[in-house]
Amino acid sequence: MDNFIQELQRLFPDLEVREGVDVPALVVPADQLLALMTELKEKRGFNFLADLTAVDYPEDERIEMVYHLLSVPGMAEIRVKVNLDRQHPEVPSLTALWPAANVQEREAFDLMGVKFPGHPDLKRILCPDDFVGHPLRKDFRLQTEGGE
């Protein structure tokens, strides 16, 4: 996998590689995510988006998007991460590459407030439409009738 990662670093000079316990993590700026994911899917055989999630790091003022990709034919796995500004978390939608990203992006939007430009129907999926806030953010406080 070393040659593979070196090739990606040549194509994406801002790419940071972090060794993981199980698989390497590629950290890429948000504006390069779509190009990297297109490369991984169309030219490198990572044909399956296993999952995506968001992690809140309020102490660092960031939200980290985490994507797990599998190459079913190549029996390989890779992790891609994107650090977002916590006040305005936004990263391109991957629904054009993987239609299954639709529901997972809606969940990250609903629960963490991440916006996905290019998403075909970005709206809440678990919370009511009139719900205020994003309940998986670490600073979220549930408001009850009559106070806290």
UniProtKB/Swiss-Prot annotation:
Similarity comment: family membership: Belongs to the complex I 30 kDa subunit family.
Reaction(s) the record says it catalyses: a quinone + NADH + 5 H(+)(in) = a quinol + NAD(+) + 4 H(+)(out)
Membrane topology, from the record: Peripheral membrane protein
Full protein name: NADH-quinone oxidoreductase subunit C
UniProt xrefs under SUPFAM superfamilies: Nqo5-like (SSF143243)
Enzyme Commission code(s) on record: 7.1.1.-
Molecular function via GO: NADH dehydrogenase (ubiquinone) activity; NADH:ubiquinone reductase (non-electrogenic) activity; quinone binding
Organism lineage string: Bacteria, Bacillati, Bacillota, Clostridia, Moorellales
Alphabetic keyword roster: Cell membrane, Membrane, NAD, Quinone, Translocase, Transport
Quaternary context: NDH-1 is composed of 14 different subunits. Subunits NuoB, C, D, E, F, and G constitute the peripheral sector of the complex.
Summary of the function given for this chain in its UniProt record: NDH-1 shuttles electrons from NADH, via FMN and iron-sulfur (Fe-S) centers, to quinones in the respiratory chain. The immediate electron acceptor for the enzyme in this species is believed to be a menaquinone. Couples the redox reaction to proton translocation (for every two electrons transferred, four hydrogen ions are translocated across the cytoplasmic membrane), and thus conserves the redox energy in a proton gradient.
A cellular component annotation (GO) from this entry: plasma membrane
UniProt organism field: Moorella thermoacetica (strain ATCC 39073 / JCM 9320)
Location of the protein in the cell: Cell membrane
PANTHER family for this protein: NADH DEHYDROGENASE [UBIQUINONE] IRON-SULFUR PROTEIN 3, MITOCHONDRIAL, NADH DEHYDROGENASE UBIQUINONE IRON-SULFUR PROTEIN 3
